[in-house]
């Protein structure tokens, strides 16, 4: 169960399965792990993997955040496939994407219903405070937004990139 997505990833996965006319009652834990394949968090990957078609990926964070809110509101989102591919296997309750910036793997988080629009800035401020207190932190950044003070992002600690590509750490 530790490898299965939490609230946000589970919501995206269930919406994807419904989109592709799959009965959720027929989907087993092993099916869900196969869908995660090698895109999950941490060191584990699952084979044989089952995948959904992948659409063009958008780099407009404000648009992705808006589409996350639609999904959280149980509304239709034309970006469901994209959001699933960017973060549907991630843990946690909050919407997020996993992406690459300058060849390095990052996680960028978006506010959920219970968060204010300044959630990203607040998390960034907490990370700055933790670093000032000499707490070891992954590299982090506040990504700009025209809709809110910004989106918190952190370099993934479970991946390492080099000339041969991205490798799992653990």
Predicted regions, residues:
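Phosphate/dinucleotide-binding and metal-coordinating scaffold of catalytic cores
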Residues: 1-170
């Amino acid at each position: 169960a530790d490898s299965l997505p939490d609230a946000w990833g589970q919501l995206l996965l269930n919406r994807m399965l419904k989109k592709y006319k799959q009965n959720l009652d027929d989907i087993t834990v092993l099916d869900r792990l196969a869908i995660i394949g090698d895109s999950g968090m941490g060191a584990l990957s699952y084979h044989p993997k089952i995948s959904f078609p992948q659409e063009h990926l958008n780099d407009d964070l404000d648009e992705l955040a808006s589409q996350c809110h639609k999904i959280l509101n149980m509304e239709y989102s034309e970006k469901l496939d994209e959001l699933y591919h960017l973060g549907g296997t991630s843990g946690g309750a909050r919407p997020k994407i996993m992406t690459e910036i300058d060849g390095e793997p990052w996680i960028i988080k978006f506010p959920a219903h219970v968060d204010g629009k300044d959630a990203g800035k607040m998390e960034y401020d907490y990370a700055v405070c933790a670093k000032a207190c000499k707490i070891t932190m992954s590299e982090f950044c506040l990504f700009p937004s025209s809709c809110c003070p910004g989106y918190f992002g952190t370099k993934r600690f479970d991946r390492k990139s080099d000339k041969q590509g991205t490798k799992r750490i653990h």
